[in-house]
């Protein structure tokens, strides 16, 4: 699919500052888009925030999280048919991040990406899990024998992935990881996404996120 760029002629002054704040990473807005056939850059008018996002703007940890997830969404979401379920999930997740205490956001990106898989059609077959099985990242299923390719998790990693399938925005703060383990989990998730979407290895915000969490 092709990418669509939105240009906002905000100008300068107080109104420009307000508009730029609305259009921050993961900003949820209602607007009028001037979409014209044959153009790759489209105009944007009358942006209006659908709910307050002051915490997302003001908290550096949440802001870094938002920048990373916005970059991921820019790669996996392409022009196509409207998907109300996906929209409601993303909006609900952003609202949850906005309302969440800052000290509880460390696992948000892990939870978001795992649950996003369902709406992208790449959700692992969690029902196929069994003790001693390994997770085949290409077929998105658990199996007893190693596949011919190298994209699979060890039995211990596979068990850990299954345990993560129970994570949601309400209980994710109960999953206690140190920075090294959290980065290993994120690396595995990004490897999984990379098998289904190109460009995941070059995310600019990934290293920044790893330094914070």
Predicted regions and their residues:
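Non-catalytic alpha-helical scaffolds and adjoining flexible linkers that form interface surfaces
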Residues: 2, 7-213
């Amino acid at each position: 699919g092709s990418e669509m760029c939105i240009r906002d002629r905000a100008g300068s002054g107080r109104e420009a500052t307000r508009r730029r704040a609305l259009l921050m990473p993961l900003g949820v807005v209602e607007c009028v888009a001037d979409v014209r056939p044959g153009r790759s850059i489209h105009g944007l008018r009358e942006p209006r925030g659908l709910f307050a996002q002051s915490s997302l703007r003001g908290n550096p940890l949440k802001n870094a999280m938002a920048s990373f997830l916005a970059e991921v969404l820019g790669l996996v979401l392409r022009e196509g048919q409207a998907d109300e379920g996906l929209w409601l999930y993303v909006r609900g997740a952003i609202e949850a991040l906005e309302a969440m205490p800052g000290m509880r956001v460390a696992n948000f990106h892990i939870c978001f990406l795992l649950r996003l898989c369902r709406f992208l059609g790449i959700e692992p077959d969690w029902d196929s899990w069994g003790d001693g099985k390994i997770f085949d990242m290409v077929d998105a299923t658990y199996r007893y024998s190693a596949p011919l390719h190298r994209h699979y998790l060890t039995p211990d990693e596979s068990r850990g992935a299954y345990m993560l399938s129970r994570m949601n925005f309400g209980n994710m703060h109960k999953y206690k990881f140190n920075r090294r383990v959290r980065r290993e989990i994120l690396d595995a998730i990004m490897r999984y996404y990379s098998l289904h979407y190109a460009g995941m290895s070059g995310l600019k915000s990934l290293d920044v996120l790893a330094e914070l969490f």
